[in-house]
């Protein structure tokens, strides 16, 4: 017996194996892989759907689970192509100044997968996916979300950026190497972060202890073995981001999407032309 969502699963599998999607694992945004952020947007979106509709069985009547899943996978795909093509504009700049670049890439990828699998997306589904991608920056982009799916992804992307897009490097990570005599450049390499991140984390720690110099902070670390890393909001963001990164690295970006609970509610006849 053929599963009602066999085509949907194959399409998403093919998309996840598309090179620009796989390359999201190689793109870093403030210390967080873009692939990790992409999963976070999916997870937040699912939680938003459950909050509003309680049960996924009810939500599927109002929300296109296929479009929202594919839209999320593709929402930052241009970060891969922009890097590969050495474009002058960043992803955020492209969303405002050249949204045609974003939308043309979406349709190109969808067309390639359709051709590879021999499936054709229903026009409304295709357009919904494209709209999700080109409107996911909301008021910070050129196109505003106009569908239920696009609005969910916009809010989820915004929350992920606010709470989970921060390099989880902490002052204690830096001081651990400083106490061994390593300089700024050496610590940058050890922690795989920029000098700006290091200086920010030291500034936050000094502020919490009301200290003026790095030497004073280092003395506190020597005495106590650790220092406060920042205010409550920063601590929350840092710890949650660290857990998120560890979880996605362990479970795998591909596996998390293929096992996401929206998959079982997808119905091929509502997604693909017959």
Please give the residue ranges for each predicted region.
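Helix-turn-helix/homeodomain-like alpha-helical modules used for DNA recognition
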Residues: 236-274
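Acidic/His-rich, divalent-metal-binding segments that scaffold phosphate/diphosphate chemistry
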Residues: 1-89
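DNA-binding alpha-helical recognition surfaces that contact promoter or target DNA
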Residues: 131, 176, 200, 204-207, ...
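Short helix-to-turn junction characteristic of helix-turn-helix DNA-binding domains
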Residues: 175-182, 221
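Basic, Lys/Arg-enriched C-terminal extension of HTH/homeodomain DNA-binding domains
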Residues: 206-242
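Divalent metal-dependent catalytic cores for phosphoryl transfer on phosphate-bearing substrates
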Residues: 28-29, 58-166
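Short alpha-helical "packing" element that flanks the helix-turn-helix/winged-helix DNA-binding module
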Residues: 170-174
